[in-house]
Amino acid sequence: MQTEKFDVVIAGAGPAGCAAAYMLSEKGLKIALVDKDTFPRDKICGDALGADVTKQFHLMSETLAANLQQFDTKIPSNGVRFITPKHRQLDIAFTKPEKVFGGGFVAKRIDFDNFFFSETAKQPDIFIFQNQKIVSVTNNQNKIIVQSASISFEASMLLVADGAHSFLNKKLTENVVEKDHFCAGVRQYYSNVKDFHPENHIELHFYKDILPGYLWIFPLPGNQANVGLG
């Protein structure tokens, strides 16, 4: 089995893992960013990102923030349209985009994650390992050994960012799913969806039969929409 030595191994190359890797780059550390999939890859998501996401990109790097502005598979969205069980409508606009680093937007998760992953992969000291599903982890004499089917990673630190179904969370902690405080959702993409708010407000529909859940309809580029129930 191939052995690779690093200062930090980051398990998961989604937004959390990429943010960690990006911020650790150029700090004199050798970083492994490991993911079980190959990018671009999809994740079930509502696809709406608030203005704070844009703000965090500015705090991380002005270059990263500028590249996000040029990322063209997104549409700006700076408000919410609520639909009540009695079909009444309420539109709430967020703070003006120019006051919050450019405001929020909606982008398919497959596109946004691939953008962030690609930007992170350009940074120095970051070594990318795709299609490497982690199968074991041990803490051995001041070093952590993380193994996939073909590679053994040795590191001083392991950052766990492997998502909602985290193998490492189950392996390293006693955390369990609290069924009384757990929710799930379904999502589908639709084409030729029209008549959104002129400023692309996301829509949250609350219907008696599904409370406390709700239906969401979020606009996407090209007259597409992310429609889900959660």
Segments predicted by a language model, with ranges:
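Conserved Rossmann-like nucleotide-cofactor binding loop
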Residues: 16, 39, 165
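Rossmann-fold NAD(P)-dependent oxidoreductase module
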Residues: 23, 115, 119
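A conserved beta-strand/loop capping segment in the N-terminal third of enzymes
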Residues: 58-112
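Beta1/beta-strand and adjacent pyrophosphate-binding region of the FAD-binding site
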Residues: 2-16, 32
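Predominantly flavin-linked oxidoreductase catalytic cores and closely associated redox partners
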Residues: 119-230
